[in-house]
């Protein structure tokens, strides 16, 4: 059984015996316990289990104790460390020198003992040795006997822990390509060096004929298939067929296509994570799967010109339920766009919520909207907006039909209930695919995302000579008047899922206007997640040594390793590029 990655907590202490160390033992160890309690009581793994922490076997005052802690952490699948102390300690003697995992240090802000002095000293050692570390120092002085963690310290500890866990969850997993390059899209030219060196992941690949092989040879669970057919007939609404009359399939042909796309979903899932039921059926090799944390399906054009498209498969893999009930989502990229798949993966591991995959399709200016519809935009839409629409698939959680405190949300599967599942299904239909584009047919996913949800749009790009760079745009979904929505939506493909998105503008750089956001977006796709998580993404990117070339996160929320400031404090974007370039990928 694979262990969850854990956070290692290291209580460091002044090594002087005969009074000094002894007086600090309880306070120091209590700091470690309080950090572990905070993390375990607040954060969860993608499967819903509380995040686990491992505390060093003793306080760390000298090198042998640092070594003992290191040995314990190696055996315990620790993916990141947090060092805590209320006092002076011996910097380079007590630090963790593992170069391939993230590190953070919380130095207690008190007057009785110089915790801040140790923090500064050990961070200097980290910078000198080229091992980045995040510095955490509370804004306000605390009393020596104060066991509470200040709110500003909590925020940084949790931001660090979320991002660090994401690095651990990715490590030693795989990206599975189902097919190859789709329509010349750069993101589907999968770069194994990027996955290996930046994420610690491997790449696997299967030809799309693996789907037909498994269908023809019955390499799927026939009982599940029968159950799925019943569920689909009961719960899935087939949408309006907008095809030309000569391209409309018969009822019998559509019935066969439903059978086909259900099998595609089952096979796509089994390829990613395996299925013990296949071993019972005599298919031991296929039962293992590919240990894929994220995958992508090429589809266009070779598959979709001949077979039903992957929209149903992609939709339900990215959704948090199917005929087997509510479950955690998979991360699955349309058109095998591995870079958007990784963008979705970053979002997912930071939030435990499903992801919207979308084309960044159109910028609608206020003037263009008024010309086309006669409507004057107002509120969050006043400066214009982006039309996010994928070519036929999207997580049903993207409908926004789940709620929290009466507001639309996308939330982890363990918070989802059956009434929300039904609401998603009721607000979605599945029209036959546009056969001018998808000659083999299939069924698209059609819905409208509810407005007023805080969301973050993300994209990872590869730049020759630099490597990966990340783009982040926080903003809100919009709910347009119904007639305005229909007028605009009908100008594209009304059989596809639509999200209207207004990025938050800052008045400068790429966020001077909504047009500038569109104009500076690095690719045709984006990954959209619930919540404003730009600050968490910036922290994660710094751990992986991926510079951020565009974001609208307030400067006070940016949290990177302390040695980033040694690359410059005025132009943070340039400092980020220099730090990432000098340090190189996390796993190289």
Swiss-Prot record:
Its cofactor is Mn(2+). This is L-fucose isomerase. It comes from Streptococcus pneumoniae (strain CGSP14). Pathway: Carbohydrate degradation; L-fucose degradation; L-lactaldehyde and glycerone phosphate from L-fucose: step 1/3. Pfam families: Fucose_iso_C (PF02952), Fucose_iso_N1 (PF07881), Fucose_iso_N2 (PF07882). GO terms for cellular component: cytoplasm. Its main location: cytoplasm. GO terms for biological process: D-arabinose catabolic process; L-fucose catabolic process. The keyword Hydrolase does not apply. It comes from the Bacteria. The active site is at residues 335, 359. Mn(2+) binds at residues 335, 359, 525. One of its GO terms (molecular function) is arabinose isomerase activity. Converts the aldose L-fucose into the corresponding ketose L-fuculose. It is found in: Cytoplasm. It catalyses: L-fucose = L-fuculose. The keyword Manganese applies. It is an enzyme of class 5 (isomerase). Belongs to the L-fucose isomerase family. Keywords: Carbohydrate metabolism, Cytoplasm, Fucose metabolism, Isomerase, Manganese, Metal-binding. Its EC number is 5.3.1.25.
